[in-house]
């Protein structure tokens, strides 16, 4: 597999690509993410992933560009990254003792084709105490994560059950992504 461009500065996405031995370089997308009138969370994450990948692909037309976006939903409410500690605590209270959905959308763009897909994973939290929430938010870990938790970090102790792709919750459905990238291998030029 030849080198792709990851249109993201996410350390988690970087780690997952490294884990799968996918050669890549990072070019962070500076696009202003806009959510239009979409019918579903899956449409939202695929659109945002496509916006990110398209913005980077404009200047890298001979490469394969990968964009991704993750959101958490509960009871038809979209939970993105919290804007502050109070919002992080509010999100964690909302998710406490309940099942929510995590959607990760992926867009892969080359000169020849564009592929978008998403994965949906259900995550159930144990009931959380106010002290657990306060200590976790004070760690700062949840402040840059959709839904205010990192399943691969300290937030892992909140997870009672998961149904679906764990790595999608982390930030990339890596097994499916590697399979999808195979159809682009001939489209990738050497860096």
From Swiss-Prot:
One MF term in the entry's GO annotations: UTP diphosphatase activity
GO CC terms of this entry: cytoplasm
A Pfam family matched in the record: Maf
Site positions (Important for substrate specificity): 12, 70, 152
Catalytic residues as annotated in Swiss-Prot or TrEMBL: 69 (proton acceptor)
Family: Belongs to the Maf family. YhdE subfamily.
NCBIfam families reported in the protein's UniProt record: maf
Protein name: dTTP/UTP pyrophosphatase
Organism the protein comes from: Bacillus mycoides (strain KBAB4) (Bacillus weihenstephanensis)
Top-level taxonomy: Bacteria, Bacillati, Bacillota, Bacilli, Bacillales
Gene: maf
């Amino acid at each position: 597999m030849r080198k792709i461009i990851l249109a993201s500065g996410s350390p988690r996405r970087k780690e997952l690509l490294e884990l799968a031995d996918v050669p890549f370089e990072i070019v962070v997308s500076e696009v202003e993410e806009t959510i239009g009138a979409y019918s579903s969370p899956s449409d939202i994450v695929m659109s945002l992933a496509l916006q990110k990948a398209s913005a980077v692909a404009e200047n890298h037309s001979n490469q394969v560009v990968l964009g991704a976006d993750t959101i958490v939903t509960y009871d038809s409410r979209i939970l993105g990254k919290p804007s502050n500690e109070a919002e992080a605590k509010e999100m964690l209270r909302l998710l406490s003792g309940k099942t929510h959905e995590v959607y990760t959308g992926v867009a892969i763009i080359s000169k020849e084709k564009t592929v978008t897909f998403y994965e949906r994973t259900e995550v159930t939290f144990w009931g959380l105490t106010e002290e657990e929430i306060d200590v976790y938010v004070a760690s700062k870990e949840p402040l840059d994560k959709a839904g205010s938790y990192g399943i691969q970090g300290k937030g892992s102790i909140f997870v009672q059950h998961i149904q679906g792709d764990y790595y999608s919750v982390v930030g990339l459905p890596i097994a499916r992504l590697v399979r999808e990238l195979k159809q682009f291998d001939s489209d990738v030029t050497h860096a």
